[in-house]
Amino acid sequence: MGCVQCKDKEAAKLTEERDGSLNQSSGYRYGTDPTPQHYPSFGVTSIPNYNNFHAAGGQGLTVFGGVNSSSHTGTLRTRGGTGVTLFVALYDYEARTEDDLSFHKGEKFQILNSSEGDWWEARSLTTGETGYIPSNYVAPVDSIQAEEWYFGKLGRKDAERQLLSFGNPRGTFLIRESETTKGAYSLSIRDWDDMKGDHVKHYKIRKLDNGGYYITTRAQFETLQQLVQHYSERAAGLCCRLVVPCHKGMPRLTDLSVKTKDVWEIPRESLQLIKRLGNGQFGEVWMGTWNGNTKVAIKTLKPGTMSPESFLEEAQIMKKLKHDKLVQLYAVVSEEPIYIVTEYMNKGSLLDFLKDGEGRALKLPNLVDMAAQVAAGMAYIERMNYIHRDLRSANILVGNGLICKIADFGLARLIEDNEYTARQGAKFPIKWTAPEAALYGRFTIKSDVWSFGILLTELVTKGRVPYPGMNNREVLEQVERGYRMPCPQDCPISLHELMIHCWKKDPEERPTFEYLQGFLEDYFTATEPQYQPGENL
C-alpha cells in the first residue's frame, strides 16, 4: 500500500502465505476460505498441461489429486501443439470494476497470468473477452476441484456446520482433504437416527499406491468420481447412500478488486452509506456499497478518535490477517473522518443477536458452536502473534447459518479518548478486561483469553451484562480479591470450569485459544471416534 507510515517490522511478523496457513500449523483447523485453490503460478508462455499428465499406471491423473474422465476436454491446443489447461467457473460472478470479467457458472477460461495471487488474468472462451477473475471461483476442467461435492481444505467442524444447515436431507455429503492424513480425503455424510437425531458421520478415503481410492480395500476405484457414483447407488456399509452434494456458499473474496489488493486506501466518493446499523461511543456502522455494486460494512469514526497515521500503521497489519472466522478488512479512507470498509455480516453483532434477534431461541449446542468459532478465529490471531484487546460479544458479527466472525481486532489500542485511555474511565470495558490489563495496561493474548471467558457468560445468558448488579469499580476491586462470577443458570459445570480457567490470576496459567478451540469443538462429541469404520465394509 502506498503509505510511508507503515511499520515494516510489525508487518513482517505476519506470515503472508496465500491460504492463510502457517509454518507452526499444529492444531490449525481452518483455511482462509472453504474452498482454497492451490494452483501453481504460471505465465502465458509456460502453462503446464495438467490434463495430459500420466502416472506410471497409465491413468490420466491430475496433479490436483483427481483423475480426468477425458484427457482432452480440458485442454486447448495451441499452434505449437502444446496443451493449455482450461479452467471452469464454479459460480456466477458479477464484475465489480472495468478490470474484471462477469461470468456464469460453467464458463471456461484460458488463464493468461496468475501472478496476482487471488486474481487471475483470463480470457473467456465464451465471450472472447479478457480481464481479471477471482481465482477461487474457478477450477481446472475435469479436476476434482470442479466437482460439486468437493470442498477442499475444510475442517471437520466446518463440514458438520455446513451439512447440518437447515434444509439438507439425510444423505447430503461432501468430500474434503483429510486433516489427519496427508494425501487422503474424508467423506462426510449427514445422517439421522432416533437416538442422535441429525448428525454427521465421517469416513476416511485412502489412496492406493497406483493412484486409486478406497474406503474399504474390498471396494476400490480408479477415481473419486467413481467412488461417489458407487456409494450414490447403494450404502454398501456406509450409514446411508450418498443422495445430494452439500450446497456450497459463495467463496469469500479478501479484496474488493485486483487494484485494491495492494492499494487499499480508497476515495471516500467510491462509498455510499445506505443504512445505519449501529451507533457507538466512537462512531457509526453502516451498510453500504463500494463502486455502487459491492455490498460492504462501513465503520465511520468520530474525528479525534484515533490518529490517522497510527490507524494506517495498524491497518497495514490488519489487512494481512486473513481467516474465515475474522471479518475481512477490505479498504480504508484514512483522512478524518476515518472510514473502515469490511465484509458485511447480515445478522449484526452477536450481542444484539442474542438479546433481541434469532439468538434468543438458541440451545446450548448452538451457543457452544458459536463459542468454538470465536475460539478458532482467536487461535489464528494467537498464532499470528497479534492481540485483539477488546474481545466481547459486541465485537463479534453473525451471518447466515449462525456463522460468527471476529471484528475490530487491534483497534482498541489506537483510541485516544481520555474516558477510554484512562482504562478505568466510563468508556472502557472494565467488565471484560483482565485485571493486569485494566490496572497496569498489560494487554497480551492471555488477557484476550480472560475476555473470552466473559464472552462465554454472555453466550449462555443470552447477552446479559457481566457481573450483574456491580459497577466497574466494584468489579475491579472484587476481582482483585479473587471473586469470580458463579455458574450461570442452566450452564453445565464443565463449561463454567472452562470459564474459571480463563480467569486464572496468573495469565500464564490460562489456556491457549488452540486448546479452547479443540475443547469447544469436541464438547458434545469427545467420546465418539472421529472416523466411522462403516458397517460390513
Swiss-Prot record:
Belongs to the protein kinase superfamily. Tyr protein kinase family. SRC subfamily. ATP binds at residues 277-285, 299. Keywords: ATP-binding, Cell membrane, Cytoplasm, Developmental protein, Kinase, Lipoprotein, Manganese, Membrane, Metal-binding, Myristate, Nucleotide-binding, Nucleus, Palmitate, Phosphoprotein, SH2 domain, SH3 domain, Transferase, Tyrosine-protein kinase. The active site is at residue 390. The modification Phosphoserine is found at residues 21, 26. Residues 14-35 are annotated as: Disordered. This is Tyrosine-protein kinase Fyn. PROSITE patterns: PROTEIN_KINASE_ATP, PROTEIN_KINASE_DOM, PROTEIN_KINASE_TYR, SH2, SH3. The keyword Phosphoprotein applies. Interacts (via its SH3 domain) with PIK3R1 and PRMT8. Interacts with FYB1, PAG1, and SH2D1A. Interacts with CD79A (tyrosine-phosphorylated form); the interaction increases FYN activity. Interacts (via SH2 domain) with CSF1R (tyrosine phosphorylated). Interacts with TOM1L1 (phosphorylated form). Interacts with KDR (tyrosine phosphorylated). Interacts (via SH3 domain) with KLHL2 (via N-terminus). Interacts with SH2D1A and SLAMF1. Interacts with ITCH; the interaction phosphorylates ITCH and negatively regulates its activity. Interacts with FASLG. Interacts with RUNX3. Interacts with KIT. Residues 82-143 form the SH3 domain. Residues 149-246 form the SH2 domain. It catalyses: L-tyrosyl-[protein] + ATP = O-phospho-L-tyrosyl-[protein] + ADP + H(+). Autophosphorylated at Tyr-420. Phosphorylation on the C-terminal tail at Tyr-531 by CSK maintains the enzyme in an inactive state. PTPRC/CD45 dephosphorylates Tyr-531 leading to activation. Dephosphorylation at Tyr-420 by PTPN2 negatively regulates T-cell receptor signaling. Phosphorylated at tyrosine residues, which can be enhanced by NTN1. Palmitoylated. Palmitoylation at Cys-3 and Cys-6, probably by ZDHHC21, regulates subcellular location. Detected in spinal cord oligodendrocytes (at protein level). It comes from Rattus norvegicus (Rat). GO terms for cellular component: actin filament; cell body; cell periphery; cytosol; dendrite; endosome; glial cell projection; glutamatergic synapse. A lipid is attached at residue 2 (N-myristoyl glycine). Transmembrane segments: none annotated. The modification Phosphotyrosine is found at residues 185, 420, 531. Residues 271-524 form the Protein kinase domain. Its cofactor is Mn(2+). GO terms for biological process: activated T cell proliferation; cell differentiation; cell surface receptor protein tyrosine kinase signaling pathway; cell surface receptor signaling pathway; cellular response to amyloid-beta; cellular response to glycine; cellular response to growth factor stimulus; cellular response to hydrogen peroxide. Its EC number is 2.7.10.2. Non-receptor tyrosine-protein kinase that plays a role in many biological processes including regulation of cell growth and survival, cell adhesion, integrin-mediated signaling, cytoskeletal remodeling, cell motility, immune response and axon guidance. Inactive FYN is phosphorylated on its C-terminal tail within the catalytic domain. Following activation by PKA, the protein subsequently associates with PTK2/FAK1, allowing PTK2/FAK1 phosphorylation, activation and targeting to focal adhesions.
